[in-house]
Structure formats: C-alpha cells, structure tokens
C-alpha cells in the first residue's frame, strides 16, 4: 500500500495501469484504491479502530488475524485496484478461481471466512447459488460490470458507483499502519498443470 502511495507522490501523472483501451495514472490509481479502501472500511471489514492485531507468534504459520476479502474476478485494472484497496483498508485479499463450481466456491468462502467479495458480473450466477448455503454472509459484495448481461446481483453494489461515491480520505489509524503486514492469501485452484 505504501509503495503505491510513494510512487503516486513522486510521479502522479505517469502511467500506472494500462488495460485494453483504458490508461490510469499513478494519481488515478491512488485515488481509486483509497476510495475502494473506504468502501471496504465503511462495510465494517478490516480494523475499525486502532487496535493491536494478534501477534504472529500466537498464530499457526497458515493463519491470518486480518479480515479476508475474496477477489472473484478476471484480470484487469479492477483486480489490481482491489488488491491495493484491500491492503489500504487493512484487509487480506485472496484469489478465487473463476472455474470453480458452486461446491468449490462454497468451500473456499467458508474456509477463508471471507467477509467480502468483489466479483465480475459474469460469475454472479454461481455466487448467487452459493450465497444461501453460507453460514456467514459477506458484509459486502462489490460487482464489476462486464458484457455478460446478468445484471446486478441482489444485495450487491456496483463497483464503479461505490468508488465514485466514496471519499479518498481514510482514517489515520489505517494509513499509519500501511504495509506493516500486507498479505495476500493464495488458494490454489488446481490449474497449475493446465
């Protein structure tokens, strides 16, 4: 999180992300990821006040004391923004293999204790089938529009609308702790041999 901020401060107008016909400067990515972090924070995901996390020595090697947020997405600027936005909100993003069937997705969301999901529209039919089977419902579902035609999932919030309405100003307790323990939780999807 802090590396993105440092580069944006030094070269705000330089290209940061180029995806298809869209070009985003470092300043634009800084702004978009801060706004996304605010959306995540306001949903009650991640630290809500200054508080110590569970010390690493009190956790097993595979455990995380932070909130987890699922990235059920294709590659694109929104994926990178989501990773950075999660870190800026003090949460841990993790990947979801978009080839998963409902039972695999249910297992992953349950095992990870996902508190939120950012999902491309094309994957909402599988997610919609899984949501009623989860014991713990996500606090936030952000949906990235695409050309699939499925429409907005009930209870979901449009990604672009959410970040457009959010403030880029974050609570100081979040910004003071950036990058001290940024993590990315990686679930293998069984595609290594493909």
Kindly give the residue locations of the regions a language model identified.
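Conserved pre-ATP/AMP-binding loop-to-beta segment of ANL
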Residues: 12, 143, 164-187, 194
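Solvent-exposed alpha-helix faces
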Residues: 34-38, 113, 193
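Structural core segment of the AMP-binding/adenylate-forming
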Residues: 42, 88-166, 173-175
């Amino acid at each position: 999180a802090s590396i993105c901020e440092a580069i944006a401060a030094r070269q705000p107008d330089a290209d940061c992300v180029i995806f298809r016909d869209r070009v985003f400067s470092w300043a634009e990515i800084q702004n978009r990821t801060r706004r996304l972090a605010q959306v995540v924070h306001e949903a009650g995901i991640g630290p809500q006040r200054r508080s110590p996390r569970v010390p690493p020595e009190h956790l097993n090697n595979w455990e995380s004391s932070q909130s987890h947020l699922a990235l059920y997405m294709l590659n694109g600027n929104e994926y990178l923004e989501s990773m950075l936005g999660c870190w800026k909100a003090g949460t841990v993003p993790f990947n979801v293999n978009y080839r998963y069937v409902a039972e695999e997705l249910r297992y992953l969301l349950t095992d990870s204790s996902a508190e939120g999901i950012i999902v491309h529209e094309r994957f909402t039919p599988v997610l919609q089938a899984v949501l009623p089977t989860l014991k713990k419902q996500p606090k936030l579902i952000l949906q990235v529009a695409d050309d699939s035609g499925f429409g907005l999932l009930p209870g979901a919030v449009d990604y672009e609308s959410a970040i457009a309405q959010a403030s880029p100003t974050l609570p100081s307790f979040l910004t003071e702790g950036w990058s001290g323990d940024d993590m990315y939780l990686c679930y293998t999807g069984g595609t290594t041999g493909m």
